């Protein structure tokens, strides 16, 4: 059995204890890498809005990562993509992206977009493996020294 075969992805409430733990790790990492004006993560309450879907990936009953899909006007935005450092390289990110893409397609979204940090190289590789390409700012984002923008047509 492969590591990916043991990963399940399920809808979750971002206000749950396990989601808060994952989001706390993610926010701490981003806050250690970038100044506040260049951090674009959503709060737990913002993630709980009706137009946002949230999932947790788990393996053997343990939360390993999370991701959110904000369904916006004409596109979907990937938010709060995070994989626990101990679980990286084991298919968790792929499982999360596949789940998110399935949902985006089922709701008729034509494109997925994201903003990520400039030095998060492993995230850039993951997104490229799944067909994302670099693009310019979108929505309310502006060009900045720490942002990389990517998108994928569905």
Which ranges hold each PLM region?
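Conserved catalytic-core motifs of GNAT/GCN5-like acyltransferases
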Residues: 14, 113-116, 128, 133-149
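Actinobacteria-biased recognition of intrinsically disordered, low-complexity terminal regions
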Residues: 1-2
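Ser/Thr-centric signal marking residues that sit
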Residues: 66, 94, 116
